């Protein structure tokens, strides 16, 4: 008799995805981030659901309703801080997951990779509209500045901005629709995550060597289920430490002031996880140019598979490409730092140089180095 998990129509899908899944025996801890992202998504959806039960999407009540959640709702402070800092954990895991993909050549699974890039864009959209909901100063001005970027689109820009705002400025209509989007997007993200997994399981996972894994695979459970459990424990511990000891560490003090259209904060800046893109946006003196650079700073990931000119998949055995990879990481960290600084000398020129370096590494230096390494293989 076949085991029920192998024959039942629904359990069979679960079994083939999480229990009897053939997995490369040598995948390292860098392969843990997929499951950690799944965990983040579950935590964010559940905490978000409970917050939505008490939140009011109205400009006269939004700020007060968040204060009410933190003061009067049972464990509301915990739910709110888990949700706010859970977003940071989500992005940490996302960036590490993408970094892993770039380092080990996982992007050659094109469908999986491109769905992943779309997922990144959706998570960024969800985080942006979510940041507006508490209706603090930085929420309001962040929404104003970022939505205003749409006005850079030729011909339809101005109309588009008014359409997104639902009026002639960021107002009640804007808050209401942002709450709608913030509620809707996670479910779209969950659906795409399933597709992401579906395409991944068509090919199987890559591994640190970049070689074919088929000769040496082991069942996902118990080996990697326990490995994932360890990763999950470490992540939850980190998240709880942040939430319980320093919940406002990554937030902006400006957001403790209710939104006021008449007072502009001295430095308008997004949450830390958007700072690298914000720095690229600001480094270009032209509005439309900045918006395009901002867009391409993320969309460039979609053409990475086309720019892979090396005969080897992973950078494990390519010291030159490894050096460039870490240069890229350093560059993104510099951009993140610049994004949080005021627009003045020397930050302007540093941001411009880092932005040029970012695109040059992806489009020119890395592919050229890959070709050079191919030549070296023949020596």
Curated annotation (Swiss-Prot):
Subunit structure, interactors included: The cytochrome bc1 complex contains 3 respiratory subunits (MT-CYB, CYC1 and UQCRFS1), 2 core proteins (UQCRC1 and UQCRC2) and probably 6 low-molecular weight proteins.
Binding positions for heme b b566 per the UniProt entry: 97, 196
Binding site for a ubiquinone: 201
Keyword tags: Electron transport, Heme, Iron, Membrane, Metal-binding, Mitochondrion, Mitochondrion inner membrane, Respiratory chain, Transmembrane, Transmembrane helix, Transport, Ubiquinone
Function: Component of the ubiquinol-cytochrome c reductase complex (complex III or cytochrome b-c1 complex) that is part of the mitochondrial respiratory chain. The b-c1 complex mediates electron transfer from ubiquinol to cytochrome c. Contributes to the generation of a proton gradient across the mitochondrial membrane that is then used for ATP synthesis.
Miscellaneous: Heme 1 (or BL or b562) is low-potential and absorbs at about 562 nm, and heme 2 (or BH or b566) is high-potential and absorbs at about 566 nm.
GO biological process, one term: mitochondrial electron transport, ubiquinol to cytochrome c
Binding-site residues, heme b b562: 83, 182
Protein species of origin: Iguana iguana
Similarity field: Belongs to the cytochrome b family.
One example GO MF annotation: ubiquinol-cytochrome-c reductase activity
Pfam family, one: Cytochrom_B_C
Subcellular localization, as worded in the UniProt entry: Mitochondrion inner membrane
Cofactor descriptive note: Binds 2 heme b groups non-covalently.
Residue ranges crossing the lipid bilayer per the database entry: 33-53, 77-98, 113-133, 178-198, 226-246, 288-308, 320-340, 347-367
Repeat found in the keyword field: no
Protein name: Cytochrome b
Gene Ontology, cellular component aspect: mitochondrial inner membrane; respiratory chain complex III
InterPro entries per the UniProt record, alphabetical: Cyt_b/b6_C, Cyt_b/b6_C_sf, Cyt_b/b6_N, Cytb/b6-like_sf, Cytochrome_b, Cytochrome_b_C_euk/bac, Cytochrome_b_N_euk/bac, Di-haem_cyt_TM
Membrane topology of this protein: Multi-pass membrane protein
